[in-house]
Amino acid sequence: MSPRLRVWLVVGAAAVAAAAIAVGVTVATRSDVHEATSKAPPFVADPTAPAEVSRDVRDALRAWPAGTVRRLRILAERYPHSALVRLELGLALAFTGNQTDASRAWHESRRVQPDSPSAVRATDLLHPGMPPGLPPFVPAFTRARTKAQRHLLRGAVFQQALRPVSAEREFAAAARAAPNDPEALTAEAVGRYDKERPAEAFSRLGPLARRFPHAQTVRFHLGLLLIYFGDIAQAKKELALARAEGPRTPLGRRAQTLLRAGRKR
């Protein structure tokens, strides 16, 4: 099996697994810490954070409960562009029962370094009722043969690394390289999805569904985004339309998996 094919299979499996959480089972709340607790907040590794920042954050967490919040506030001043510091500061504040300041820290994490796993995780904590992460683009092909598909491949890899800004950049490049390709245009729309601004993606996918009424990729991803948005009923309709366009294709089978998960609710 080629490395590229393995990447695509992982991306597809991640889409099904993450969406099935929302359709088939209750999503666990990851910020259900509204009261003070003696338990120390976890360290959530971020590969984009410099080693020095990660080390300082770990040292601050080891001081729990005395001095952790103060130390993390100092680190936030020292590292003004670190999403990791603000993610951990928010967790520490939440664990002390200060949910208002925790939310403020998580918003800051998104603002100062949006292209990072910490920013994605901060968004999850701000929206605990939604599936974790962001909806991935799932390709209909298994090997990149064109310039646009190579951009899609790189975008998918960035998504797997929780680098949404870099992924969006690659998907936009794919759309420029193939402006009439529904798959590239769909990826561009998916890359724009943000839990705080979902309209940026839906406002593009809706017109694509009318422009390409039989494009399986459009219907599949519209259904996938609707799952993340929480509109399960409409998601099932879109996934059924995607399946009808080719039940034996990779996307058709994944649509069937999600529909089957939906019936277990």
Q: Predicted segment positions?
A:
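TPR-adjacent "capping" and linker segments in tetratricopeptide-repeat scaffold/adaptor proteins
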Residues: 36-52, 73-78, 132-150
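Alpha-helical adaptor scaffolds
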Residues: 53-66, 73, 127, 147-160, ...
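Start-of-helix register in tetratricopeptide repeats
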Residues: 54, 84, 117-121, 149, ...
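Canonical positions in the second alpha-helix
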Residues: 74-75, 108-109, 140-141, 173-174, ...
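Canonical tetratricopeptide repeat
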Residues: 88, 121-125, 153, 187, ...
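Register position in tetratricopeptide repeats
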Residues: 95, 125-132, 160-161, 194-195, ...
